[in-house]
Design a protein with these regions (language model features):
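Glycine-centered hinge/linker elements that transmit conformational signals in sensory
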Residues: 207-210, 244-278
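Short helices/loops that flank or line small-molecule/ion binding pockets
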Residues: 100-113, 130, 183, 206-211, ...
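Extracytoplasmic/periplasmic substrate-recognition and gating elements
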Residues: 306-371
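Conserved N-terminal structural module of periplasmic/extracytoplasmic solute-binding proteins
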Residues: 8-9, 13, 22-125, 343, ...
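Hinge/lid segment of periplasmic solute-binding proteins
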Residues: 32-55, 97, 119-173, 203, ...
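Long, aromatic- and glycine/proline-rich binding clefts that accommodate carbohydrate-like moieties
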Residues: 350, 363-392
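Bacterial N-terminal signal peptides that target proteins for export
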Residues: 1-7
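Extracytoplasmic/periplasmic solute-binding protein
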Residues: 58-60, 117, 158-170, 174, ...
Length: 392
């Protein structure tokens, strides 16, 4: 089955469904056990930060890019490379609800201005127009082999002839997690096997949920699905609810394929297959065996939000449209905006390159995989490969 990526920036053109702030719920920041550290070799392909340059960059965000060593966390590959080149990251913590206001206040006051800030959909063009960021062309050469394969994407973030976003990587936006023990107990087909055979589609997903819910004991309420899945289901058609030809927008809501997807979602809702509550994370969603699928980003199913030793949880992509051979995945783009007022040019350049190298070099990607599996010992290699397949 062919897999095509759809950047998360295009989600607005596909659906009006929204999701609560990712990462805001769960206990992934606590109870972390010491994990085995993975050795990461240095690279000669990235220059060290000059001795006379500012070597520390300030990161403003809702999470720390540095590991919490008191909790036994390992460094990311990119942080290891950055430290080896003389760089350090200073963390300024902000809440999800206040991050944009605090960034704007820092820029306006020119006090404690962060050097980098996570790319999100508001960054371009809205926040660029507010003069919150500076172009990256002075520190990123998109003709360089390290950056060449993201140039097309970077060209979508040009204003006034300048690039404002340097894409680091693309990661699957959502996956469906389920409990294999529940699947086996109900005598249902294994979704992962269906996925491997190219048969994981709307039809068997719907049938599976219907059977699971209808077989509930008299005193038990069951649901087929919870989380953020509506947008992704529509995207499996390969169509958008609004078309843009480079000059004008046109309404595409009456496209027959869009209508098929919407009818499917209507049936899923009408037949009470959806638990519409905010359950927070996979651990909460799957704990009692009365929900078949939990659909959310990997943040909600890893770390302390993920499976425990006794769990047999698995993951699959959002089921595909049975009327097409293509598989479309919403892809979240990782990038760091260079904040207006930052003077750490050389250090930010180095950070960008370390991040990009960590996500493109095969050895470093293998290091990253090992770190992930060490931190998530109840994720199997097959589960990790689903992430890779849907992110590539």
């Amino acid at each position: 089955m062919k897999i095509k990526k759809i950047l998360a920036l295009a989600v607005a053109l596909t659906s009006v469904f929204a999701v609560a702030g990712c990462g805001s719920t769960g206990d992934s920041s606590s109870k972390v056990s010491t994990v085995k550290k993975v050795k990461v070799e240095d690279t000669q392909e990235i220059e060290a930060i000059p001795d006379d340059a500012q070597k520390t960059i300030r990161w403003m965000g809702t999470y720390d890019l540095n590991p919490n060593e008191k909790k036994g966390e390992d460094k990311s590959v990119e942080m290891t490379l950055f430290n080896n080149k003389g760089g350090k990251v200073e963390y300024t913590r902000v809440t999800d609800s206040e991050k944009f206001d605090q960034l704007a206040s820092a820029i306006m006051a020119q006090q404690n201005v962060p050097d980098i800030f996570k790319y999100e959909w508001m960054a371009f063009p809205a926040q660029v127009l507010k003069d919150m960021y500076q172009p990256v062309d002075d520190i990123v050469n998109f003709d360089d082999p390290l950056w060449a394969d993201v140039k097309t994407t970077a060209d979508k973030f040009v204003m006034g002839g300048k690039h404002y976003v340097a894409p680091i990587s693309f990661t699957v936006g959502t996956l469906m997690m389920y409990d294999q023990d529940v699947i086996d107990a109900e005598g249902l087909d294994d979704p992962y096997e269906l996925y491997q055979n190219g048969e994981w589609n709307w039809d068997n997903w719907y049938d599976m949920m219907s059977e699971f819910v209808s077989n509930a004991p008299a005193d038990v309420e069951r649901f087929g699905i919870n989380g953020w899945f509506q947008t992704q289901v529509i995207q499996q058609t390969g169509k958008t609810m609004v078309n843009y030809d480079g000059e004008k927008f046109t309404n595409n809501i009456n496209d027959p394929d869009i209508e098929r997807a919407e009818d499917l979602l209507y049936q899923v809702g009408k037949n009470n297959l959806v638990n519409g509550n905010w359950l927070g994370n996979a651990k909460q969603a799957l704990k009692d065996g009365n929900l078949l699928f939990y659909c959310m980003g990997t943040w909600a199913m890893t770390g302390n939000n993920g499976p425990s030793d006794a769990d047999t949880w698995r993951v699959v992509p959002v089921p595909s449209d049975p009327n097409t051979d293509e598989k479309y995945m919403t892809s979240d783009m990782t990038a760091y905006m260079w904040v207006r007022g930052s003077t750490a040019k050389e250090a930010v350049k180095c950070w960008y390159e370390c991040c990009r190298m960590a996500n493109t070099d095969e050895t470093y990607k293998e290091n990253g995989k090992e770190k992930f599996l060490n931190a998530n010992p109840n994720w199997t290699e097959d589960m990790y490969q689903v992430i890779v397949d849907c992110s590539s």
